[in-house]
Each structure stands twice: as structure tokens, then as C-alpha cells.
Design a protein with these regions (language model features):
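Membrane-embedded multi-pass helical conduit in multi-pass membrane proteins
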Residues: 1, 328-422
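Internal catalytic domains of large membrane-associated glycosyltransferases
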Residues: 2-301
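Loop-to-transmembrane boundary segments
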Residues: 26-59, 121, 314-340, 406-420
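C-terminal catalytic/acceptor-binding lobe
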Residues: 256-339, 346-360, 417
Length: 422
């Protein structure tokens, strides 16, 4: 029984798994008469990579990472969804990519997303949805079963782990209600970490740690950045939102509501590597980092979306299931806004507001906050040590002494947290 085998080993370290071996075991099980499990060799992985105006220096390594996975390339359908507003240069890059990877995958599909379509905002969601609709048409034309096609969405700088598609395919096959699951890898922002400025490196590593910790708490996990879902489920719910800035986190709530609470996100504990923020000048980089974090913070718009549904008469998700999720969503965005300045300055607020305060709280609060900061410093030291092990190999053009800056950069943590996280 593949379900029993899965449950017996789910607590083991998944990074040590040879998922090709597990898929081979599932193939043998699927040959048993009466076994209703999907046959692994009938599963296809479709990868939708969206692009705006990125150059080949960004796009080619990302496609190569998909090519180099351990999953058979003849069962990978690659879709490049690129924006019409990216101009002629993007059009040329798309054609060059298709020519370069001709014959590598089952198919390499180019989908140009038109500009100014009715009912769409300018963003990733409309591009993904437009590409997803074309993918569904392609699958119908090729007479493939949509229930056996797993769709992974990627940004143009995303480079997946070699085991990612095998891992997703295995998790997909062993779940009886597989259409009601999404599969979430760990986003690690280290592709270009050696070239990034110190403040951006601090933010990139901090976000990477947050994603690692999130993967350890599957009951709280939501869609973020790159993720995978079955094509049949995506088509049933009209793919991704075309009206929200943050389409990934919003996809969790859309899926939860559409499937009436029968929806979960499965952690895929292997990385998909992404870029840290780099722009032209230092000022442009600082601004671009702010814009990226602001975009993520637009997930706060889900508070109104979820709250409205929670208290709606049309709600089909059990109240006791949805209410705790709503409160965690609300708490997360509020905490994000105030935590850094409160920890830094909150202990002194009572005395600053009332210099004559003699109460025990006003007197002891600075000491309490000081203890918290001391414990936080210990955690920061651990973070520094672990982050050094996460670094990719130093490029030849980067000097050896720059590794020292990977430690010194953390003195910027308080400033970065206050400026960018509040």
C-alpha cells in the first residue's frame, strides 16, 4: 500500500530520498491488478515560466535547471508566457529560447500575453492564467489526461532543484485526493547573492530562513512564489487571479474557498533558487527592494477578501476551520508592520510619553526588552553561521575577502528590519 509506506517514512529526512527509486516502486505497485493508483509513467509535468523583459542571461539558466532535473524530459511540457509589453526584444529572446531548447522537452510552447486585456491588472497573475489556458488547450489536443498533468509556475529567475519534479510527482501519486493539494517548494534567494549589496543580502537570507521555517509548519503553509497544482484543479477554478497584485498567496484562499475547505499545501522540502534584488545603481537597488517587499505586503488585501467570505451567508468552508486561518492572516500582517520598531524602541515608550512614570511596568519594560534583544542576538549569530553554509560557490570574479562581508553585513539587520519591514 503506497499510502501506508508514505506514512511510515514521512518523518524521515526527505532531502535524503531518492525519489526516482520511490517512483519506480510506485510503478511496480501500479502494475498490480486492481491497483487504482495513477501510474507514475503517465504523469506529465508542465512548467509555466512567466517573463516580462528579462534577458537571455536570466532566462537560459532557469530553463537549463528544468532540463537538468531527474524527471524525464520527454514528459515535461515547457510553457514560456511572455508579455507583449516586453517589446520586440522579449519577442526575440522567446524565439531564441525555443530554438535553443528545441527537442529537449516534450514540447516548448510560446504564449504571448496581450497587453490591456479587459478585466486584468498589470501583473503576473494574468500572464500565468493566459498561459495556463493555452496549456489546457494543448493537453486536450494531445489527448492527455488533465488529471495527470502537474503544473508548476516559475518566475524567470527561478532555478529548480534537480529532484523537485520527481518529489512533486511522488507526493502527487501517493495522495488519494490529489486534486485538492498544492505543492510548495522552499524559495531560497541566493542565485546572485555574491553580487548583491549588503542590505539586499540580509533581506534575501532572512526571507530564505523564513521560507525554510514555514516548510516545517505544514499546517500553516500557503502558496508562495513558485508552486505546483494539478491542471484539472487549476482549470476548474479558472487558474490564477487576474485582479490581485499578489497572485500566489491569494491562490491559497481561492483554492480553499473553491474546494470548500478541502485544500492543503504540501511542503516540498527541496529548494527553488531565486535572485536577490539587484538594479542599476545603489539607489535603484534600494528602491527595487522596497517595491518587491511592498508587492508581497499587498497580500494584506486578502484580509478583506477572506473576512468578507468568512462572514458571508454563501460561505461553504466551516467557520471553525476558516476563523483561525483568518486571525493568523490578520495577525501576520499587523505583526509585520510593527514588530521591528516595537522591539527596538518599545521599551522606552512609557518613559518617553510620561517622564514621571514610576510604575513597575514603565521601570522594568526596558530591561525586559533588553533580554528579548539579547536572545534575538543569539538567534542572529546562529543565523549568520547557518547562512554561510547556504552560500553558493563564490564566482571567480568575486574576491575572497568578500566572504568576510557576508558576516559583517549583519550589523545592518536592525536598520534593514525597521526600514523595510515596518
Amino acid at each position: 500500500d503506497p499510502h501506508r509506506a508514505y506514512e511510515a517514512r514521512r518523518e524521515e529526512r526527505r532531502t535524503s530520498y531518492d525519489y526516482q527509486e520511490h517512483l519506480q516502486n510506485l510503478r511496480l505497485l501500479s502494475a498490480v491488478e486492481g491497483n487504482s493508483e495513477p501510474k507514475p509513467h503517465e504523469i506529465y509535468n508542465a512548467v509555466i515560466m512567466v517573463a516580462y523583459d528579462e534577458g537571455l542571461e536570466t532566462l537560459v539558466p532557469s530553463v537549463e535547471a528544468v532540463r537538468d532535473t531527474t524527471f524525464p524530459n520527454e514528459r515535461i511540457i515547457f510553457v514560456l508566457g511572455y508579455e507583449e509589453r516586453g517589446g520586440e526584444k522579449m519577442e526575440q529572446n522567446a524565439r531564441e529560447l525555443k530554438e535553443k531548447f528545441k527537442g529537449v522537452f516534450k514540447d516548448f510552447i510560446l504564449v504571448k500575453h496581450p497587453d490591456n486585456l479587459k478585466g486584468e491588472i498589470v501583473g503576473k497573475g494574468p500572464n500565468l492564467t493566459y498561459a495556463g489556458e493555452h496549456l489546457a488547450q494543448y493537453v486536450e489536443k494531445k489527448r492527455l489526461r488533465k488529471e495527470n498533468v502537474i503544473v508548476t509556475s516559475l518566475d524567470s529567475d527561478n532555478r529548480m532543484s534537480k529532484k523537485y519534479l520527481d518529489y512533486v510527482t511522488y507526493e502527487f501519486c501517493v495522495r488519494p485526493d490529489r486534486q485538492h493539494y498544492a505543492y510548495q517548494p522552499i524559495s531560497i534567494f541566493t542565485n546572485n547573492i555574491w553580487e548583491a549589496a549588503a542590505p539586499m543580502r540580509v533581506i534575501a537570507v532572512s526571507n530564505s530562513f523564513f521560507n525554510i521555517i514555514s516548510a516545517m509548519r505544514p499546517h500553516l503553509l500557503k502558496n508562495f512564489a513558485s508552486h505546483s497544482q494539478p491542471l484539472a484543479a487549476l482549470e476548474a477554478m479558472d487558474f490564477w487571479s487576474k485582479r490581485t497584485i499578489v497572485e500566489d498567496g491569494h491562490q491559497y484562499w481561492r483554492s480553499l474557498f473553491y474546494f470548500e475547505g478541502k485544500y492543503e499545501v504540501v511542503p516540498i522540502r527541496v529548494p527553488i533558487y531565486q535572485d536577490a534584488v539587484i538594479a542599476g545603481s545603489t539607489w535603484e537597488t534600494l528602491k527595487a527592494q522596497f517595491v518587491q517587499l511592498r508587492r508581497w505586503d499587498y497580500g494584506a488585501s486578502d484580509v478583506a477578501y477572506v473576512g468578507t467570505y468568512l462572514f458571508s451567508k454563501e460561505r461553504k468552508v466551516p467557520f471553525l476551520q476558516l476563523f483561525p486561518k483568518f486571525m493568523r492572516l490578520l495577525d501576520g500582517h499587523i505583526t509585520l508592520a510593527y514588530m521591528a520598531p516595537i522591539v527596538a524602541f518599545g521599551g522606552w515608550v512609557p518613559k518617553l510619553m510620561n517622564a514621571s512614570a514610576r510604575g513597575a511596568v514603565a521601570f522594568n519594560l526596558p530591561n525586559v526588552v533588553g533580554w528579548i534583544q539579547t536572545f534575538a542576538s543569539i538567534g542572529l549569530i546562529i543565523t549568520v553561521l547557518v547562512s554561510l553554509g547556504m552560500l553558493p560557490q563564490r564566482p571567480d570574479h568575486v574576491k575572497k575577502k568578500n566572504k568576510f562581508s557576508m558576516v559583517i553585513q549583519w550589523i545592518l539587520m536592525p536598520v534593514v528590519a525597521i526600514v523595510y519591514q515596518s
